[in-house]
Amino acid sequence: PVGKAAELSTPTQKARALGMYMADYNVLKAIGKPTDEVEGVIAKLATDLNVSFVLDILKEQAPKDATKEQLQAFLNAQEDKIIEKMAAENKIDAEVEMLGAASAEYACLVANPTLVVEGDATSAGLSTNMEKRVSMLEEVVADLAAYYPDLKQLGETIAPLKEKVASIQSARAANAEIMGIRDALLK
């Protein structure tokens, strides 16, 4: 819900929310739904965090009539671009918070039967990458937690996602727990 963004006060919460809205934006874009409302929130959060380039990168269009594989490659390249730019701007902690929260949001989307149908471009790409994504984040968090204490909480919060998103079926079975993980990130 976009209204919740106004309640966020700390940079950590804002970075996590930005990651969640970025995930929503990509999924809305992939299924051809309007993105204006989410774009507005992304713009505000990105401005607050001084990373306004995020929206410009997100708005780049995927190739028309892209196959599932091409769309996945495009989204991965886009994420890499955001990561590189944030690293260049020395915002590694915010970037990891964003990626962690985006993973939790993607897990919610995979787990929600009303949002994603199996075989849909988004769910197909998401479920195969989710475990890998959470494992990678765990490694990064372990490396950085000494410098950024908030990351330790992020890592501990999202770690259980790994077994819950092994398949679309397991994600759906764990829907309520996955939603709880996502909600815990914004507390």
Predicted regions and their residues:
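Long, charged/polar, soluble alpha-helical segments
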Residues: V2-E7, F53-P63, T67-Q70, F74, ...
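Extended amphipathic alpha-helical interaction segments
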Residues: K64-L151
